[in-house]
């Protein structure tokens, strides 16, 4: 682990070469639930909801889940856009907005980034 100067924070990093859902399931099975401070989601849009639920299990209260591409080049507001990825992100955004387990802030930078603070 790396150590930040003047801080009690320790940075852990590791590389897992497997499908993301499999890796997240394994982390939970290994007892790592509620041990992470931060999770970043930027993967296949169809599985965003699954990645989010797994991340919510892994991140401890007070932690942050950052979700990339939530504006999807503005396509999420085009109700005529029925592409599977667009529909998946639109549905995910709606569910996230109603999730009382987190407080959220959508940042309109790049392709959109949502920060979800786990209560």
Q: Model-flagged regions — what are they?
A:
Residues 12-20:
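Conserved SAM-binding strand-loop segment of SAM-dependent methyltransferases
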Residues 1-6, 10-11:
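Single conserved hydrophobic/aromatic residue that forms the stacking wall/gate
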Residues 37-47:
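A short SAM/SAH-binding and catalytic strip from SAM-dependent methyltransferases
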Residues 18, 41-43, 67-69:
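Active-site flanking residues adjacent to catalytic metal/cofactor-binding acidic residues
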Residues 27-38:
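A short acidic, Gly/Pro-enriched loop at the edge of an enzyme's catalytic core
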Residues 24-29, 52-55:
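Distinct, well-ordered alpha-helical segments
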Residues 47-119:
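C-terminal substrate-binding/active-site "lid" region of AdoMet-derived donor-dependent transferases
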């Amino acid at each position: 682990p790396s150590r930040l100067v003047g801080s009690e924070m320790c940075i852990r990093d590791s590389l897992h070469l497997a499908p993301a859902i499999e890796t997240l399931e394994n982390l939970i099975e290994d007892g790592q639930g509620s041990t992470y401070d931060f999770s970043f989601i930027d993967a296949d849009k169809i599985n965003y909801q699954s990645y989010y639920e797994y991340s919510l299990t892994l991140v401890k209260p007070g932690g942050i889940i950052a979700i990339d591409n939530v504006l999807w080049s503005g396509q999420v507001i085009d109700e005529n856009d029925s592409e599977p990825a667009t529909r998946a992100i639109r549905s995910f955004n709606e569910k996230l907005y109603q999730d009382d387990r987190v407080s959220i802030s959508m940042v309109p930078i790049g392709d959109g980034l949502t920060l979800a603070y786990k209560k």
